[in-house]
A protein has these predicted regions:
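Core structural elements
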Residues: 18-29, 56-64, 83-103
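Structured ligand/cofactor/substrate-binding pocket environments in proteins
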Residues: 6-31, 83-86, 117-142
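Conserved small/polar residues in nucleotide/adenosyl-binding loops
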Residues: 268-269
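Catalytic adenosine-cofactor/nucleotide-binding cores of aminoacyl-tRNA synthetases and other
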Residues: 1-49, 149-150, 198-201
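Cys/His-coordinated zinc-binding microdomains
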Residues: 259-262
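Short, flexible, mixed-charge glycine/proline-rich loop motifs
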Residues: 245-251, 265
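Short cysteine-rich clusters marking metal-coordination/redox-active sites
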Residues: 255
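Acidic, turn-prone loop/beta-hairpin segments
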Residues: 36-67, 98-189, 196-211, 234, ...
Length: 269
């Protein structure tokens, strides 16, 4: 930030180290799941209709960030750009998208359409973040790019990614922003059970949501157990606007493959 004198002390350095760790962990997750199979995608050929809404929502987020990247770089607001990219890594990706999609990436068949689409989006995110972070994390992005690029070139010689305008979807953004609020409330209820030692991880829980008609319809097309990262989830209509969340320990046995608590574990699960 060139607009004021630089402030530095031990606490500030600790904060920056923690922020950098979050960014590195975001890249590490993508690299681990891509397993050296990074492939540049032709953004214009991406067929949004073939992707789940969650992936479409993340692509919308990339579109919004792309506009902000251009604006901040043109005005030399690198500190503002850094904060926005950090929040995207920590909140939208690590704590939300990656958390939900771990089960798909780790347990689904390598040939499943859902997993393939998830991997495509990881490729898109990785390529975009590498270029956007390049002016700020010069050496880190160069190191990562040298691992994934099949060409002997520098990340700093590449052009910026161009996000297609049709990835922007304000209606979908509003829907998933509201879904995110429901997830936050559910996470709080689950965390209380974890704190009291009634359950360990969230996958040991089953939840029952009592919600009004608006929120009920909002969750209609959502795999509730996958979205809330629990073993079982149900919803029922309520006349109250306030969400009521009942969290209990799931009944059954732990599946060694997906770690969910299933009443009957079989090879077909």
């Amino acid at each position: 930030d060139y607009s004021e004198d630089l402030r530095i002390d031990k606490n500030i350095l600790i904060q920056h180290a923690e922020s950098y760790r979050k960014i590195r962990n975001t890249f590490r997750f993508m690299l681990g799941n891509l397993k050296d199979n990074f492939e540049k995608q032709d953004f214009e050929k991406i067929k949004l209709a073939e992707f789940d809404e969650l992936e479409q929502f993340i692509l919308h987020k990339l579109s919004a960030i792309s506009d902000s990247v251009t604006e901040n770089l043109n005005s030399y607001n690198l500190h503002r750009l850094y904060k926005e990219l950090l929040n995207f890594c920590a909140l939208d990706l690590s704590s939300f998208h990656f958390d939900i999609r771990k089960d798909v990436l780790y347990c689904d068949s390598i040939n499943s359409k859902k997993r393939k689409n998830c991997v495509i989006v990881l490729n898109i995110i990785l390529e975009s973040l590498l270029k956007w972070f390049a002016p700020i994390l010069v050496f880190t992005t160069e190191e990562i790019y040298s691992l994934v690029s099949k060409k002997n070139e520098s990340i700093h010689e590449n052009n910026f990614v161009k996000i297609p305008s049709n990835w922007k979807n304000d209606k979908l953004n509003e829907k998933w922003s509201n879904l995110f609020k429901i997830k936050q409330e559910t996470n709080i209820a689950i965390e209380k059970k974890r704190t009291s030692k009634e359950i360990g991880s969230s996958l040991e829980a089953e939840i029952k949501l009592s919600i009004n008609k608006e929120k009920f319809e909002l969750l209609n097309d959502i795999d509730l157990a996958e979205y809330f990262i629990v073993s079982k989830a149900e919803k029922k209509l309520s006349e109250q606007d306030r969400i009521e969340i009942e969290v209990s320990k799931a009944k059954g046995s732990k599946c060694e493959r997906c770690w969910k608590i299933i009443e009957t574990v079989s090879y077909t699960h």
